[in-house]
């Protein structure tokens, strides 16, 4: 008997069909994320992934593993220690610990991130099943697992997949608490909400939004504030992040410089910024999916579910208004939006599959409908496979190692290079002072700073030996820098790089 909110006829009324479908979804969802497992992580947000890779390598090398030269161990630790810690390095610590048993393989992180996303999908299925229906849960989960951007982003080495998993698990446990306010659900919801916020402080928007929506959808505000369990949940949610902030801002002072540049009041009045925000949201979640998700709000029957979705959408808007620069420039800031759209699609999907179930009541018609749905899933998977196979980045490791050897792995290097020099750091074992790209210059000018290329060149190259260029597109955008470098002889050159010798006087 169907005990879930929907009263529609179920397309997945057969228990075996449902089991096979769910197992297939999660099996394929995990499998496609492991495709091209050992390809270098340069296909998605390489700057952020390399940051985590450098941290994990430094943590691992600090344990004195065998077979690593002392100079490399010291450099790895130094590269780790000099990286900013905006949030706790939880995932990096997990990966570094795993390196003790597997050796250093960056793709270990890809497996962990994929697992986090899959586990999040399990909680999403349970949540939507309880709020909408089994049919809605199947479609919401399929979207969450197989939207192309979600596949590529969810296997990246950064805290976001872990954060999204924790957010969704909080949604489910809090929803269970609203149905049965026991101390077990209280503690679980508080701990999972606290974990999500600790992983990344921005998760607070989606934890609070869900809690407010579900809470006010079920109880009055007077009932909520009178419940001791609510205060315990709030305390458990706040304490972990508060302790980290106290350590970083008061005790050890390593966070003071990390919270600037997140909010620009002027961008709130910029139409272009809102267009860029929409563009990033459409890239991450799909413009049509967002539209159908919004239309899905009209199909919600239960007050608690409706308020839950209102809370999520409302907090997403506040999240974007607060992170007004990053929401329009960093597409991975949209990752928590994917499960919001997934849940919002469920009511419309439930209605659609109910109509499909009525129209395919016969056995053969039902089989044909299943084949059509399977074809759609196969097509999406094949397109994702083609995308993942498109570029083989593995040869780049040898190029960066060659550059490091040419530069001698020492100091005295300035570089105009990709990802703030982190490819050079990781595969080339070479540190460098990084010349700003045009995006950085624009960002700092937005914050009120000014930039003079000639003055900056004289300051940064004073006492240096080499100037490395690997980002030639960026060099073409900075004509003043190009002119300054043309006065120096070329020290070394290869496929994808050129090194200028700063030790010699400029040519007359």
Language-model-derived ranges and their functions:
Residues 26, 124-146, 164-165, 184, ...:
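Transmembrane-helix signature of polytopic, membrane-embedded enzymes
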Residues 29, 140-145, 193, 197, ...:
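Short helix- or helix-capping micro-motifs
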Residues 30-34, 203, 348-353, 363-392, ...:
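Transmembrane alpha-helical segments
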Residues 52-62, 195-198, 204-308, 312, ...:
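Transmembrane-lumen/periplasm boundary regions of multi-pass, lipid-linked membrane glycan transferases
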Residues 108-131, 169-173:
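Transmembrane-helix motifs of polytopic, lipid-linked glycan transferases
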Residues 129-135, 170-186, 196, 300:
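Membrane-interface transmembrane helices that cradle and orient dolichyl/undecaprenyl
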Residues 149-162:
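Short acidic/glycine- and proline-prone juxtamembrane loop motifs at membrane-interface regions
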Residues 389, 404-442, 465-472:
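Short periplasmic/luminal acceptor-recognition loop of GT-C membrane glycosyltransferases, typified by
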């Amino acid at each position: 008997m169907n005990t879930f909110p929907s009263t529609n006829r179920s397309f997945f009324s057969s228990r075996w069909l449902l089991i096979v479908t769910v197992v297939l979804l999660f099996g394929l969802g995990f499998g496609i994320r492991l495709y091209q497992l050992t390809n270098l992580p340069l296909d998605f947000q390489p700057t952020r992934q390399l940051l985590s890779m450098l941290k994990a390598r430094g943590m691992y090398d600090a344990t004195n593993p065998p077979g690593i030269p002392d100079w490399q161990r010291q450099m790895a630790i130094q590269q780790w220690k000099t990286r900013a810690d905006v949030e706790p390095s939880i995932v990096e610590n997990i990966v570094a610990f795993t390196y003790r048993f597997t050796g250093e393989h960056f793709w270990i992180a890809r497996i962990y991130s994929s697992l986090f996303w899959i586990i999040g999908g399990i909680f999403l299925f349970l949540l939507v099943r309880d709020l909408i229906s089994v049919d809605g849960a199947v479609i919401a989960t399929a979207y969450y697992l197989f939207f192309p951007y979600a596949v590529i982003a969810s296997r990246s080495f950064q805290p976001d997949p872990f954060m999204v998993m924790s957010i969704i698990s909080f949604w489910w446990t809090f929803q269970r608490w609203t149905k049965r306010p026991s101390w077990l659900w209280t503690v679980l919801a508080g701990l999972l909400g606290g974990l999500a916020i600790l992983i990344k402080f921005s998760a607070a928007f989606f934890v609070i939004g869900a809690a407010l929506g579900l809470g006010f959808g079920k109880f009055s505000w007077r009932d909520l504030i009178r419940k001791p369990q609510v205060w315990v949940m709030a305390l458990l949610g706040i304490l972990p992040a508060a302790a980290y902030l106290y350590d970083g801002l008061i005790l050890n002072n390593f966070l003071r410089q990390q919270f600037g540049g997140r909010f620009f009041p002027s961008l709130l009045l910029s139409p272009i910024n809102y267009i860029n925000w929409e563009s990033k949201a459409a890239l991450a979640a799909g413009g049509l999916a967002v539209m159908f998700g919004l239309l899905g709000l009209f199909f919600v029957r239960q007050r608690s579910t409706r308020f839950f979705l209102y809370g999520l959408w409302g907090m997403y808007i506040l999240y974007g208004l607060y992170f007004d620069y990053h929401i329009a420039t960093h597409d991975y800031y949209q990752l928590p939006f994917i499960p919001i759209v997934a849940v919002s699609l469920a009511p419309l999907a439930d209605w659609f599959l109910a109509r499909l179930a009525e129209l395919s009541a016969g056995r053969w018609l039902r089989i044909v409908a299943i084949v059509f749905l399977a074809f759609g899933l196969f097509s999406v998977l094949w397109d994702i496979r083609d995308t993942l196979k498109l570029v083989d980045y593995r040869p780049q490791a040898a190029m960066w190692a060659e550059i490091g050897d040419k530069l001698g792995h020492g100091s005295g290097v300035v570089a105009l290079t990709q990802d703030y020099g982190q490819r050079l750091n990781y595969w080339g074992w070479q540190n460098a002072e990084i010349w700003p790209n045009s995006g950085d210059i624009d960002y700092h000018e937005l914050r009120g700073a000014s930039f003079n290329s000639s003055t900056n060149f004289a300051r940064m190259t004073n006492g240096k030996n080499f100037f490395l260029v690997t980002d030639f597109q960026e060099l073409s955008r900075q004509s003043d820098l190009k002119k300054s470098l043309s006065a120096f002889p070329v020290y070394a050159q290869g496929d994808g790089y050129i090194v200028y010798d700063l030790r010699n006087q400029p040519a007359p």
